[in-house]
Amino acid sequence: MLYDFERTAPEPQGLGLVPMVVEQSGRGERAYDIYSRLLKERVIFLVGPVNDATANLIVAQMLFLESENPDKDIYLYINSPGGSVSAGLAIYDTMQFIKPDVSTLCIGQAASMGAFLLTAGAKGKRYCLPNSRVMIHQPLGGFQGQASDIEIHAKEILYLKARLNGMLAKHTGQSLEVIDRDTDRDNFMSAEDSVKYGLVDKVLTSRNEAGN
């Protein structure tokens, strides 16, 4: 049973027409789709809902980049409304597991599990663009079945809530009591408010400010 942060997170519809980049070399031309070309620069995109498919792709890309160079940072760009808790935790655990620092950057929005992954980046390397929006809240879910089964799943979602709030407290520096209160309902923040709260470290207005 998957518990979703996002009430109406749809299945990904794809990114539409993907531009191609042609590189010239001594051995001729080589064409890449734009995302594969950016992967060479250690840039990964989390765009749209967080689900098993997107999680598997992101985990695979992080593991590949670690094998390529375990001492060089990875850059995770996030524009997501949130989604599956289990899929998001697969990404989270991999971010903490691999050797390279994962720098996170919110472009557009990072809501619910998107916000959780944003704040899970390496300390000092978590960023927002000026007009980004960040939203945190408690996990959501529903289950139908026998009363005993509903009780089991209710206990599980309460366990996940406590677990996720504890991790948010760790990454933001807020107390568990503050996190419990502030995630009780949808809690939207501007980029500047996200810095004050500890979800990110800095608002970037130009690439030079990242220090990368």
From Swiss-Prot:
It is found in: Cytoplasm. It comes from the Bacteria. It catalyses: Hydrolysis of proteins to small peptides in the presence of ATP and magnesium. alpha-casein is the usual test substrate. In the absence of ATP, only oligopeptides shorter than five residues are hydrolyzed (such as succinyl-Leu-Tyr-|-NHMec, and Leu-Tyr-Leu-|-Tyr-Trp, in which cleavage of the -Tyr-|-Leu- and -Tyr-|-Trp bonds also occurs). One of its GO terms (molecular function) is ATPase binding. The active site is at 112 (nucleophile), 137. Its EC number is 3.4.21.92. Its main location: cytoplasm. One of its GO terms (biological process) is protein quality control for misfolded or incompletely synthesized proteins. GO terms for cellular component: cytoplasm; endopeptidase Clp complex. PROSITE patterns: CLP_PROTEASE_HIS, CLP_PROTEASE_SER. Keywords: Cytoplasm, Hydrolase, Protease, Serine protease. Pfam families: CLP_protease (PF00574). PANTHER family: ATP-DEPENDENT CLP PROTEASE PROTEOLYTIC SUBUNIT. Cleaves peptides in various proteins in a process that requires ATP hydrolysis. Has a chymotrypsin-like activity. Plays a major role in the degradation of misfolded proteins. NCBIfam families: clpP, PRK00277.1, PRK12553.1. Belongs to the peptidase S14 family. Fourteen ClpP subunits assemble into 2 heptameric rings which stack back to back to give a disk-like structure with a central cavity, resembling the structure of eukaryotic proteasomes. This is ATP-dependent Clp protease proteolytic subunit. It comes from Thiobacillus denitrificans (strain ATCC 25259 / T1).
